[in-house]
Amino acid sequence: MPTIIVTGGSGGIGAEVARLASARGVPVAVHFLQNKRAAEALVEEIVSAGGRALALQADIGREQDVVRLFDTAARELGPVAGLVNSAGVVGALTRVENVTAAALEEVFRVNVIGTILCCREAVRRMSTAHGGSGGSIVNVSSIASRIGGAGEWVHYAASKGAVDSFTLGLAREVAVEGIRVNAVSPGIVATDLHAKAGAPDRLERMAPAIPMKRPGTPHEVAQTILWLLSDAPAYITGSILEIGGGR
């Protein structure tokens, strides 16, 4: 069974993707940056249930780390045929006039450069033009790329807009090389992202603005990602699927 790599796999949407994939018999490389304890606990959970998984540390904004991540995953778990780019940073909620250059650089380094580097390594290994057997890439974007994030995180929204554009371009570039590239665009999802951005009450505060009147769950997003990774949507590439409760 081909391996999938899940960046940002130690928590939230990424962790749920890893759980669902392993339940289907797929070996999973669980990437983490700092939360080693959570990543190793997830791997232990997967292995205890009969799955195969490995926790791998990397800073996806650093080229050498990304190459090492993919090389190790392939060596320890088998050929890589799936990539989920779930890792991302938000930074503090703030208006544009208060954003620092350092904050901008970090958001774009991880959300954009990190995503592109991971996709590059996936293509090098999965593309039939490079001797691979094909595969599927799913980038985790955000509904913020469409609505702009005004008053909260315009800089984050802009980084996800870049992810959307990249997804469309890469999908067309590798369409005849056996690789499908899509993105999911979650709305407000019940993860720790909001607390990390300094707004622990954001889920409750924003719920009334959602037509379904509730935030989504990591499981709901992960199910869509697993579907895109599967062979079921064989004719779908270059799509950005919104998972926002109608927002």
Residue ranges and their predicted role:
Residues R214-I243:
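C-terminal substrate-recognition "lid" of short-chain dehydrogenase/reductases
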Residues R124, R172-E173, A234:
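Alpha-helical segment proximal to the catalytic Tyr-Lys
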